[in-house]
UniProtKB/Swiss-Prot annotation:
GO biological process annotation, one example: phosphate ion transmembrane transport
Natural source organism: Natronomonas pharaonis (strain ATCC 35678 / DSM 2160 / CIP 103997 / JCM 8858 / NBRC 14720 / NCIMB 2260 / Gabara)
Gene name for this UniProt entry: pstB2
Pfam families per the UniProt record, alphabetical: ABC_tran
Biased segments, Polar residues type: 1-22
Protein's recorded name: Phosphate import ATP-binding protein PstB 2
GO terms for MF: ATP binding; ATP hydrolysis activity; ATPase-coupled phosphate ion transmembrane transporter activity
Amino acid sequence: MTLLSTLRGISSPARQQPGTQSESRRGGDTLAERGLAVAGVSHGFDGTAVLESVTLAVDRGETVAIIGPSGTGKTTLLRLLALFSEPDDGTIGLDGTDVWRQSERQRLAARRRIGMVFQKANLFDTTVRRNVRYGLSVRRSWRERLRSWLGGRKRQESVFEALDIVGLADAASQSASSLSGGEAQRVAFARALAYDPDFLLLDEPTSDLDPRNTAVIEEAVDAARSRGLGVAVATHDMHQARRIADRIVVLLDGQVIEAGPTERVFSDPDDARARKFINGELVY
């Protein structure tokens, strides 16, 4: 049974214990032996530092919300977690393995285990169904594509299951160009889910959506997490972060200034700057 076929109507399992740690291969920070992680990561553009010595891990079966002011590095951190580029310093690991010390083929295999939904949905001018199926085509290895081609019915089932999760199964034959912005974002979410990734990264996924579409996305996030995906969400919406996240990471000026269980961070943060940000008192 696939992940997608069991996402709906399943209660959340007990939280997994945090992964153990091993030494990073590039620095003194530790790299989680389970899940998707960064250890001591720094990164910048054109000589300007964006992230400085960031360490965090996303384990399977949990949702981590990354919050902080605009321009503080949330999107850059997600893109590094998605393995879009190599960090200037530090380690990016998948289940304890330094991905950027692997071969290109191994990195491609690792990248296929990670789905990402951007702030703005980028859909093709074709049907909703074909947009979702595109994720299956580009993310799977040639062996997986061959098996999928030989089992076309299973491939179609994956597409419709993903669309059903976001409430758009009835729109499968509809042109993507006719969708509202919220519906397009839901299609992008379905596309990321269709190939059953281990980890899902969301960059401000509901920033421009109405309450109904926001609720659908949040329900889909919770369903994915409840069935074992590790989810990381960058959001400026404090209420959303508190609703959907198991853990909170607060970024300020490219550094993690606070991290911990959601209720503890919101009710009693250790860092004074994090407290001011959460209370809306930080002038930035």
